[in-house]
C-alpha cells in the first residue's frame, strides 16, 4: 500500500457508554472477588439522573449493586446535580436475574478441561510492530489523549473540564510506515465559565502537546478542538449510555476486524471476551517472536463445545517464516479451549473494571499482553 491515511477514535471514562461499561465490569469484579466461578452477564443503561443494571447472574456471592454503581460514577467524576448526573442522588434500578440452565448444561462439564464455550461466535485478535506495545498507532494515541484529559481534569490542573470527552487521530502512512499525523480531533465537556479560546489553548498545551510526539506534527497537521465551540451538556444528560456500544474503541480502532461481541460485564466463560483476549495474546506473541510484522487471528466456537471450530491466521504478506509453521506453532503452544485459555491467562480474577476505559489491549498490566511465549515460538520457528 502506498500513501494513505488511517483514523481511530476513543472516548473518555466519562462518556455515557463507557460509564455503562465500567459499572458492568465493576459488578463483575465484585462478584468474581467472592466467587471466581460465577456466571455473569451484566448490562447497564444510563440516562439523566438514573442507572439501570440488568442481566443474568448465577453466583453464591452477594454484592451491593447500588453502592457499586454509585462508587463507580463517583470515581469517574459525576458528583454534582448541575451535570445532570450525580453519583449521590441518581436512581439505581436493579433488574438482574439468573443465567438460563439451558446455557449452564452446555458450559459446565464434569471434567473442567472440557468446559464448553458459553455461546457460538467469532473473535479476532491483532498485533502490529508499528508501536512498542505492538498496537496500531491511531487507537493508541487516541486513548492517550482522552486519558490525559481525565488526568488534568482530576488533578485540578484544568478544573473547568468535565468527564465526557472524545478524541480522534488521523495518521499518515507511506509504504505501511508512519510518516506523520494529519489531523487531531478532541472534544471535551467543560463548565460554563471558560471561554472557547481559553479552553482550546489549554487543551493544546496540557493535553495534545504532552501526548503526541512532536516529530509527527507539522504545520500541515490540522487540529479540531471542540469544533462546535460549546460542550457544556454532556455525559448521560446529553446522550444515554449502554454497555457494549464502543467495541471498536475497546479493541483496535478499526485497524483489525471485529467479531461483534462486546466485552464488559461478561465473565471469562463468555468467549466473546476471553477468546478475544486469547487471540490478542497469540497475535502479539507471534509478532514479538519476529514471525511476522502484522498478525490477525480469527477464532470461532460452538456453544457447549470446548475446541474452537476454526482458527485462521492472516499476516498480510509480512510473515518471516512459512504460514504452516505459524499455524502449527499456535496449535502446539496455545490451549484455546475455554478452560485452557482461562488458565493460560489467569482470567478468573477481578481485573476487569480497569479494562472498561482506554482500551482492553496495549496495556501491559493485563495478562493477555504478556509476550512470554515469544522465545518458545522463535525456537519452534528456527528464528535466530
UniProtKB/Swiss-Prot annotation:
GO terms for molecular function: ATP binding; magnesium ion binding; methionine adenosyltransferase activity. K(+) binds at residue 43. Mg(2+) binds at residue 17. Keywords: ATP-binding, Cytoplasm, Magnesium, Metal-binding, Nucleotide-binding, One-carbon metabolism, Potassium, Transferase. Pathway: Amino-acid biosynthesis; S-adenosyl-L-methionine biosynthesis; S-adenosyl-L-methionine from L-methionine: step 1/1. Belongs to the AdoMet synthase family. This is S-adenosylmethionine synthase. It comes from Aliivibrio salmonicida (strain LFI1238) (Vibrio salmonicida (strain LFI1238)). The lineage of its organism: Bacteria, Pseudomonadati, Pseudomonadota, Gammaproteobacteria, Vibrionales. The gene is metK.
